């Protein structure tokens, strides 16, 4: 194809860079998995297909036990018709643990919740833990206004770049800097189901918009 298009095709990998020693190459190789490993390490522009978080295995799931967390945050995917997911994370010895989760689907339960009810669910999830901030989609304007009015949580609006988020999450899973307590059953289920679309009209990488509410959080 490159001859037909009068294009020059170059392929190289880290092994072609003589300035990189073995330890640096090993570190970079350990950072990626799945499609990102094939692209960034092997230099192969392969299609994004299959399960997105291939590095998430049974070793990524840990017992729900007390730990000496130094910091807590909550990340939230807010939905009205779609499910709402809240994920509680704690930092311990340089590793982020998903400590607990909240998940509610109005469609599944037949019960839609108000902003006030979701705020109560957030407070129950957190309890008396010193949660520093809530990370949430900027489009959840009414809920953000309610949280700010309560003056308990600092709000940080999430970056909605999906591919950057997937790449970052893939890296920290691969490096075992993100682990999930076994009580977070919805999240664990989504890690096993969250997949790439087989083909998009413009050739862009996109996840299937299913089994993605904990993933979006």
Locations of the language-model features?
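A residue-level signal for conserved active-site and pocket-lining positions in enzyme catalytic cores
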Residues: 12, 41, 86, 134, ...
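Conserved beta-strand scaffold positions in the cores of enzyme catalytic domains, especially
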Residues: 7-11, 73, 155
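Hydrophobic residues at beta-strand termini and immediately following loops
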Residues: 10-12, 41, 99, 158
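Charge-patterned, long linear interaction tracts outside catalytic cores
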Residues: 208-217
């Amino acid at each position: 194809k490159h001859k037909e298009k009068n294009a020059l095709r170059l392929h190289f990998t880290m092994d072609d860079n003589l300035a990189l020693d073995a330890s640096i190459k090993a570190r970079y190789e350990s950072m990626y998995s799945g499609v990102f490993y094939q692209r960034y390490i092997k230099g192969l522009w392969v299609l994004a297909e299959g399960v997105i978080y291939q590095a998430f295995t049974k070793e990524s799931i840990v017992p729900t036990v007390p730990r000496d967390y130094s910091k807590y945050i909550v990340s939230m995917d807010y939905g009205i018709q779609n499910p709402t997911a809240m994920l509680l994370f704690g930092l311990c010895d340089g590793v982020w643990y998903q400590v607990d989760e909240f998940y509610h689907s109005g469609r599944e339960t037949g019960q839609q919740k108000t902003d006030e009810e979701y705020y109560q669910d957030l407070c129950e999830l957190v309890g008396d833990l010193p949660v520093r901030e809530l990370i949430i989609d900027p489009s959840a304007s009414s809920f953000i206004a309610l949280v700010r009015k309560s003056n308990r949580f600092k709000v940080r609006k999430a970056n909605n770049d999906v591919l950057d988020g997937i790449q970052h999450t893939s890296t920290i899973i691969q490096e075992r800097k993100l682990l999930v307590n076994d009580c977070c059953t919805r999240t664990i289920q989504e890690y096993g189901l969250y997949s790439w679309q087989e083909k998009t009209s413009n050739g862009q990488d996109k996840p299937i918009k299913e089994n993605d509410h904990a993933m979006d959080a």
